[in-house]
Regions:
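Short secondary-structure subsegments characteristic of cysteine-rich extracellular domains
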Residues: 149-160
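Short glycine/proline-enriched turns and hinge-like loops at secondary-structure junctions
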Residues: 124-125, 143-144, 169-171
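Short, surface-exposed charged micro-motifs
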Residues: 103, 130, 165
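A short hydrophobic beta-strand segment most commonly corresponding to one strand
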Residues: 127-132, 155-157, 171-185
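A short beta-strand-loop-beta hairpin characteristic of the jelly-roll/cupin
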Residues: 132-151
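Fe(II)/2-oxoglutarate oxygenase catalytic core
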Residues: 1-103, 107-115, 121-123, 138
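Short beta-strand His + acidic residue motifs that chelate non-heme Fe in jelly-roll/DSBH
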Residues: 115-116, 139-141, 158-170, 178
């Protein structure tokens, strides 16, 4: 569902173009075993803490206080302050109560995000929003039985509890900022 348009995304796109190394800093989604994101490059702005624990005791201690919905700022969020202004605008528009994951995903021409459904605990807690930073006709976004083209500067909500996928049949990179926001619904 289209929830906003005419968002000025140019300052963020220029900032990203000045820092191409940010696409290579975190390959977690792309490298996830059997994951749907092998054609995706991501800039992680906010995401849950990804820790490695050397002992069972350390892991158990971490899990005793773990909040699966908590996301933390990653270094690129400070490097791209232009993203923060768009995120805060979106939060105000939708009555956001808590900010979760925020990432910028790029799908090359001919690339895709394979069909998948996000985890129920996540989809029941957060609403998923896309802010379109770059796109072109030929990008097909499907959620359930609905296919949409999302234009530059638009903000969309979609039901990520439904099977969804993206196919980039355009000649340009498809770049979206994805924001998970807890709303009062």
């Amino acid at each position: 569902m289209l929830i906003g348009h005419s968002i000025d995304v140019m300052p963020l796109m220029l900032a990203i173009k000045r820092r191409p190394n940010l696409w290579k800093e975190d390959t977690y989604l792309r490298d996830y075993p059997q994951g749907p994101f092998k054609d995706v490059e991501s800039i992680m702005l906010r995401f849950p803490f990804k820790g490695v624990y050397e002992t069972e005791a350390e892991l158990k201690n971490h899990l005793s206080t773990y909040d699966q919905h908590e996301s933390i700022d990653y270094p690129p969020y400070a490097k791209l302050p232009e993203a923060r202004s768009i995120v805060m605008f979106l939060m105000a528009q939708v009555g956001g109560e808590r900010l979760g994951r925020v990432m910028i995903n790029k799908i090359r021409p001919g690339g895709r995000i394979y069909p998948h459904v996000d985890t129920p605990s996540h989809t029941e807690y957060y609403s998923r929003f896309h802010v379109v930073l770059q796109s072109a006709p030929g990008v097909d976004f499907r959620a359930g039985d609905e296919h949409v083209y999302m234009g530059v500067g638009e903000a969309w909500w979609f039901n990520n509890a439904k099977e969804h996928e993206v196919i980039n049949n355009s000649g340009v990179d498809r770049i979206h900022m994805i924001c998970d926001v807890k709303t009062s619904k």
